[in-house]
Amino acid sequence: GGKIDIGYIFPLAGHYIPHKVRKFLNQEENKNVVFNFWQNHTPAIAEKVRTGELDVGFGGYLKMDDMEFFPLSAQELVIITPKEHPLSEMQEVPLVELDYYPVIGYESASWMGTYAKYLYRKYQVNPNTIVECPDEYSIVSLVRENFGIALMPQTDILLNADGINIHKIMGLEIYRQVFMFWMKDRYRLPAVERFIEYMKTQQAEDANDTENVSKIYLKDIVNF
């Protein structure tokens, strides 16, 4: 038995977390474990991990010395445009094109919102962000209805999204790495320990090129 409280960012809600948790619960020793789920932005999740309300968090990287961060899946950043759009014929779109069209962005408080701003500074892009959204579903919906274009990770939301074009970023490979994090010096129930170790083995199975991806990404980590 045991109880595990986890928090995770919105892009992991559609498939990643439900799928991983179900596989964990299907193991004989875990069948009586109870999960509580909570969705939010990375900083809010980290705060609840720190107070002990959550055992484990899943989100972006934060510079926190009292927490352990373990890299899990990595998603390439892409530009999405509406079906009928001047860029629609281009397979790859330069990042600078974000300067020339209205942009649908992330809420500033979210990890992805902060990361996007960092990337804009790094690559000297100055987009006109007309609206900030809490999650990828909202971004895709607004792009589909021709309110603007967007920079976002290639999540499973995009696999089933119609009415939009997905473009690689020309000449750049930028990734959003998802991390699992927990408090370093805190007692954890055996079920929580098993779940952390299970997720680490899942990462190894999912890896493919994740190791290389992490290296590309980790150069970009900044202290927000």
Can you say where each PLM-predicted feature lies in the sequence?
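A late-sequence structural motif
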Residues: 16, 167-209
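Paired acidic/hydrophobic, glycine-rich loop segments that form the ligand-binding mouth/hinge
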Residues: 7, 55-59, 79, 148-153
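N-terminal hydrophobic or amphipathic helices and topogenic motifs
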Residues: 1-15, 19, 26, 193, ...
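Flexible hinge/capping segments at coil-to-helix
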Residues: 67-103
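Secondary-structure junction motif
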Residues: 102-123, 188-196, 203-214
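Central regulatory/effector-binding core of bacterial HTH transcription factors
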Residues: 2-64, 132-133
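Beta-alpha-beta core module
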Residues: 65-71, 75-76, 90, 137-185
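Hydrophobic hinge/microswitch elements
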Residues: 41-45, 50-53, 109-167
